[in-house]
């Protein structure tokens, strides 16, 4: 990556990937299946450790399930960290943290000046995403997303070790 054009392309690629990954939480929290149809390849795989879905239509359909609709109606939200992106020509790998946050219905409400009354939130889970991406004629697309909960098991640490090793 010596030329100015090469460096500019790398910056543009990373910004496009940042945008794609940053769009995931609002899509999940609003039930926007269109994001998954557009951002994921038709044969993409999402591997959540406990379950998988294959194909962008199947992945998008998860958002319309009664279970997902119930949790977003209850205030659940996804909060993503900035991904670490490694470019490899027309493919890329991104590693990022993802917090799943829920209203804390059991806490006593607290008033904060200028911010109103709230019982606060709690981190329901914290995990690691690995995003495998491919450059297409329509921009970067997800070919595979793997998520592992940071719960002391090996899966999440393996994903983090990949990012730290580079």
State what each model feature region is.
Residues 106-118:
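Short, surface-exposed loop/helix-turn segments at secondary-structure junctions
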Residues 33-104:
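A solvent-exposed, acidic/Ser-Thr-rich amphipathic alpha-helical stretch
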Residues 1-26, 30, 38:
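Short, low-complexity N-terminal intrinsically disordered segments enriched in polar/charged residues
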Residues 91-95, 116-158:
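Short beta-strand edge/turn micro-motifs at domain boundaries
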Residues 111-113, 160-163:
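Flexible, surface-exposed loop regions and adjacent strand-edge segments
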Residues 11-15, 73, 120:
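Short helix-capping and inter-helix turn/linker motifs at the boundaries of alpha-helical repeat units
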Residues 16, 75-77, 124-125:
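Short, glycine/acidic-rich beta->alpha junctions
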Residues 21, 78-82, 128-129:
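Short structured motifs
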